[in-house]
Design a protein with these regions (language model features):
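Acidic, PIN/NYN-like endoribonuclease modules and their adjacent C-terminal/linker elements
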Residues: 1-2, 101-136
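Short, well-structured N-terminal submotif of metal-dependent ribonuclease cores
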Residues: 1-38, 52-65
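Alpha-helix capping/helix-boundary segments
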Residues: 12-13, 41, 80, 100, ...
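Acidic catalytic patch
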Residues: 65, 70-90
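Structured helix-beta-strand junction loops
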Residues: 33-34, 69-70, 91, 108
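Amphipathic, hydrophobic secondary-structure cores in small proteins
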Residues: 94-96
Length: 136
């Protein structure tokens, strides 16, 4: 699998911090195969880690540096914004979920690893939502 094939949602990456070893190991396994994320995913991960989990900034930065080393990072652009609004209109997803989906579509990803969206759903005949914690 190439980096462009898999796109990671924040909901999955946060399991790197989980006490659930099986889920943390699964995310590490997927990341070892590389993937793509957006700047939004980095921001959401940092916000949850700092605010909700109370982690120290240096620790959060270290984890994000590791993720960035194995994932391509795509920017948020006006194109991403416009595509996200079209996804909101067509599918009814929240704006923030739609921004992640739009970034994955623009990156050419085939799989979106997410725990927040419907497992197996195909978006725009290109992107399949995969919950990596559903039995394989």
């Amino acid at each position: 699998m190439s980096a462009v094939d898999a796109f990671f949602d924040t909901s999955v990456l946060l399991y790197l911090l989980s006490k659930d070893a099986a889920k943390a190991d699964r995310v590490e396994e997927l990341l070892a195969a590389r993937g793509t994320i957006s700047v939004q995913v980095l921001n959401e991960f940092a916000a949850v880690s700092l605010r909700k989990l109370g982690m120290p900034l240096p620790e959060v930065k270290e984890i994000l540096d590791t993720v960035r080393a194995v994932c391509d990072v795509v920017p948020l652009t006006v194109e991403t914004h416009d595509r996200a609004l079209a996804i909101v209109a067509r599918y009814g997803f929240s704006l923030y979920d739609s921004l992640v989906i739009a970034a994955a579509l623009i990156a050419g990803s085939k799989r979106l690893y997410s725990e927040d969206l419907q497992h197996g759903q195909v978006i725009d005949r290109q992107l399949r939502v995969v919950n990596p914690f559903v039995s394989r």
